[in-house]
Amino acid sequence: MDPGFDTLDEAVRATFPVQSTRIVAVSEHGDAAVALFDTRPGAEPYLYEVHYYRANSRWSEGSSSNGSGWHGLSPESDLGVETSWGDAPPDADMVRAERDGRVFEAPAALGAYFLVWWEVLDARADVKAFRVKGEWVRAPATWQEMLAQQDAWRRARGS
């Protein structure tokens, strides 16, 4: 049985060893939260998402994933939290995304972006652009992201 933690910060910091992981961002909403980690900060980034919940005044780790997406908050509701995250271009300080026809902007930092929508139905957000040195630059298409990821894997394997 997980005894939980007094604070969300304690729960987040206990998820991975601090010497080998970097906390990129945390978003809290009532008794739920989600954090984005870089689990390989000294090399090619490896982002990882972890959900947290508070029950009986104690924070505990919930599900986790190496991909963004929608996560239900309660079996009694169709609403949940949607995340969209990934690598940001060098020098990017903002990200622009579109969800349900609406445009959203959020900070990009530490080479990553992290967008969070709470109390939403399952839908997909699309990243459209990054602000780099004051100028908005179109985000790569999904196929371009996949090619970049394949290149990163090849470099990591030395092939």
PLM regions and their residue ranges:
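A broad structural signal for short, well-ordered beta-strand segments within beta-sheet-rich domains
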Residues: 20-23, 61, 92-94, 122-124
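Ser/Thr-rich low-complexity repeats and stalk/linker segments
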Residues: 53-56, 78-83, 93-159
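Surface beta-strand/loop "capping" patches
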Residues: 67-90
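Long, contiguous interaction/targeting segments characteristic
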Residues: 1-72
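Short beta-strand-to-loop capping motifs
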Residues: 37-39, 88, 118-119
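Well-ordered beta-strand positions
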Residues: 27, 87, 107-108
